[in-house]
């Protein structure tokens, strides 16, 4: 950074939560020219007619006034619908389990928002994500946040070199308790505000009820691979591979799990046992590849991977099939690898990039999760 902090404009995305509030506070204390932006991505009026976005924006206003920075609200509802929510529905329609947070970061927070910030004269954008950016060996590297429990690089795996070059993560070196403490000491209005969880556009609503508003449910048969009927399902879109709860299968013996889907015949396949081999894969084909790092210029390399958020790192070999596809060979079989979810690659603390899980194999045989 060649400019002095006071000459450097940073536009920060503020959600009305404690993380982005403290991120804004830190930037202001470091002397940057800070502007707070509240992104309205969804019309989220709840069942009681209360718009939670309005409440969140009021918290942003209060915090920005406390810190002493200007603020604006920007409406990205159309972009969010077109780029994130439509994708979300398409994936569920195809029987997969999508991760809208990854797409939101790629298309909204680090694209639409970044473009808007640059129009405001921003040198950088910032967010309250738990991640770090470092410039080393001629490229920008995205590193895990130091708080292992909160690290969010999994959701940021599609960011490009260009996006990272204009991004700051003020919370990357901090742990959550420190952030709460800073907010309390500064008297910020959001200091004790509960963290948001789940998918942002669903909020506190029932997932089945929400999804049925957009995709008509198609109940069908729940059966074993040998054809023994075990009950009925409410609609394939409501179940994910490895799911136990909500199947409603009683009886003695090991618990039952969802092990596959047949979209053509609308069948949910189930079987018993947490360690059932039908739930384990050792080879994955993943598409929609995005690379943060230049390491991917190699045709084959070893690294670790996460196949879902908060999962422990797994040793893998990545083979580049083409610019959009990779084959992943796992050192050990991994449970419940789920089509539609993100697989994210790491070299130590560095996030190399990620892709969308498409096909899963075990000992060379394709697991027909989406038969």
Swiss-Prot record:
Keywords from the named record: ATP-binding, Cytoplasm, Disulfide bond, Nucleotide-binding, RNA-binding, Transferase, tRNA processing, tRNA-binding
Site description Interaction with tRNA, residues in chain: 129, 341
Gene3D superfamilies: Adenine nucleotide alpha hydrolases-like domains (2.30.30.280), HUPs (3.40.50.620), Translation factors (2.40.30.10)
Disulfide bridge partners, by residue number: 104-200
Chain segments carrying region Interaction with target base in tRNA: 99-101
CDD domains to which the protein is assigned, alphabetical: MnmA_TRMU-like (cd01998)
GO cellular component term of the entry, any: cytoplasm
Keyword Transferase: yes
Catalytic residues identified in the record: 104, 200
Protein name: tRNA-specific 2-thiouridylase MnmA
Organism: Bacillus mycoides (strain KBAB4)
């Amino acid at each position: 950074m060649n400019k002095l902090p006071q000459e450097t404009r940073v536009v920060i995305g503020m959600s009305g939560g404690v993380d982005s509030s403290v991120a804004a506070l830190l930037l202001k204390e470091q002397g940057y020219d800070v502007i707070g932006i509240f992104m309205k991505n969804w019309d989220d009026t709840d069942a009681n007619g209360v718009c939670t976005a309005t409440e969140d924006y009021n918290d942003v206003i209060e915090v920005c006034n406390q810190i002493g920075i200007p603020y604006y609200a920007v409406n990205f509802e159309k972009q969010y619908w077109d780029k994130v929510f439509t994708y979300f529905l398409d994936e569920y329609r195809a029987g997969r389990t999508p991760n809208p947070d990854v797409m939101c970061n790629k298309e909204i927070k680090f694209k639409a928002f970044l473009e808007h910030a640059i129009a405001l004269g921003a040198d950088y954008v910032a967010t309250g994500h738990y991640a770090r950016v470092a410039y080393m060996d001629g490229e920008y590297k995205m590193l895990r946040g130091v708080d292992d429990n909160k690290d969010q690089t999994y959701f940021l795996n599609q960011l490009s070199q260009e996006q990272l070059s204009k991004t700051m993560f003020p919370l990357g070196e901090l742990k959550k308790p420190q952030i709460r403490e800073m907010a309390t000491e500064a008297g910020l209005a959001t200091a004790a505000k509960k963290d948001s969880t789940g998918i942002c556009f669903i909020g506190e609503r029932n997932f089945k009820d929400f999804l049925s508003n957009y995709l008509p449910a198609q109940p069908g048969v729940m059966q074993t691979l040998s054809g023994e009927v075990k009950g009925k399902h409410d609609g394939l879109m409501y179940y994910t591979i490895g799911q136990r709860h909500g199947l409603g299968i009683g009886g003695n013996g090991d618990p039952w799990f969802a092990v596959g889907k047949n979209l053509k015949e609308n069948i949910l396949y189930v079987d018993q046992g947490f360690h059932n081999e039908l739930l384990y894969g050792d080879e994955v084909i993943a598409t929609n590849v995005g690379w943060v790092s230049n390491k991917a210029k190699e045709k084959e390399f070893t690294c670790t991977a996460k196949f879902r958020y908060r999962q422990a790192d797994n040793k893998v070999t990545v083979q580049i099939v083409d610019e959009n596809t990779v084959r992943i060979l796992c050192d050990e079989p991994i449970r419940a690898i789920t089509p539609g979810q993100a697989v994210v690659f790491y070299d130590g603390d560095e996030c190399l990039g990620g892709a969308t899980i498409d096909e899963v194999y075990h000992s060379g045989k394709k697991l027909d999760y989406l038969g």
